[in-house]
Amino acid sequence: ITYTDCTESGQNLCLCEGSNVCGNGNKCKLGSDGEENQCVTGEGTPKPQSHNDGDFEEIPEEYLQ
């Protein structure tokens, strides 16, 4: 499953699964030592092109809490 964007709840959580899914010109910085991934300003690889409408799902609620 691929998630579209970072949350905007102050956690700055993003999921980096083989590509940058931060959007808005940001790149995904992988967390180390148990830290969360973060979207940071900077050039990243583009989102993968979606061939099906369902390729990008909304972020599940459990990630937004």
From Swiss-Prot:
Subcellular location: Secreted
Renumbered residue ranges of the record's region Interaction with thrombin active site: 1-3
A Pfam short name: Hirudin
Disulphides: 6-14, 16-28, 22-39
Chain segments carrying region Disordered: 33-65
GO cellular component: a single term: extracellular region
Positions of post-translational Sulfotyrosine modification: 63
Glycosylation: residue positions: 45
Listed name of the protein: Hirudin-2A
Organism (species): Hirudo medicinalis (Medicinal leech)
